[in-house]
From Swiss-Prot:
Segments of skewed composition (Low complexity): 84-99
Gene it is expressed from: PIDD1
Primary location group: cytoplasm
Post-translational modification summary for this protein: Cleaved in vitro following UV irradiation to induce caspase-mediated apoptosis and this cleavage is inhibited by a broad-spectrum caspase inhibitor.
Summary of subunit composition and partner proteins: Interacts with calpain-2 catalytic subunit CAPN2.
Region Disordered, annotated ranges: 1-22, 76-156
Keywords: Cytoplasm, Cytoskeleton
Coiled coil region boundaries: none
Subcellular location: Cytoplasm; Cytoplasm, Cytoskeleton
Membrane-spanning intervals of the chain: none
Protein name per UniProt: PIDD1 alternative open reading frame protein
Length: 171
């Protein structure tokens, strides 16, 4: 295997590629074989479509694997991502399939399905169920409770009186 033999597992393809400047998106190492398979990371896309890194740019500008990009966005090195618990905290990082999102601006209290809260500002003592609100996996924005919100109620329902509005909520 003279032309196909590549570096062993743990070099530029398995986690270290994003940090060392290699591109694991262009070539993927398979465990046990120790060889690179061109274009395996993106079916239907050839490595040439990814394009080389222009001269003068740092090696970090090279395309990297999506899992490594997500790990970098969360402050986790790709090598920690693939090896389990990190040396710093002893806790494993997020799974490669979990999106790493920046915190949303504004109030961070989220109205989750089935969560119990209070209507505000008119009747703070009346509990309300937010079951009709979008869950945490929905689009950001409408599911965040803003000051003065009535939990998932239409403005007309909220104006008609607290007792009536609460009685119409599904339990």
């Amino acid at each position: 295997m003279s032309g196909l033999q590549g570096p062993s597992v743990g070099d530029g393809c398995n986690g270290g590629g994003a940090r060392a400047g290699g591109s694991c998106c262009r070539r993927r190492c398979f465990r046990g074989f120790g060889r690179r398979v061109q274009g395996a990371a993106f079916p239907g896309r050839q490595p040439a479509e990814l394009g080389p890194v222009p001269r003068g740019l740092p090696a970090a500008a090279a395309p990297v694997c999506p899992a490594a990009s997500a790990a970098a966005a969360g402050g986790i090195l790709a090598s920690e991502h693939s090896r389990g618990p990190s040396a710093a905290g002893g806790h494993p990082g997020p799974a490669a399939s979990e999106p790493v999102l920046p915190p949303l601006p504004g109030p961070q209290r989220r109205a989750t399905p089935g969560h119990t809260g209070c209507l505000s500002p008119g009747c703070p003592d009346q509990p309300a169920r937010w079951s009709e609100w979008p869950g945490p996996s929905g689009p950001p924005g409408p599911e965040l409770q803003q000051p003065g919100d009535t939990a998932g109620l239409c403005p007309a329902d909220a104006r008609s009186g607290c007792a009536l509005a609460v009685s119409q909520l599904p339990l």
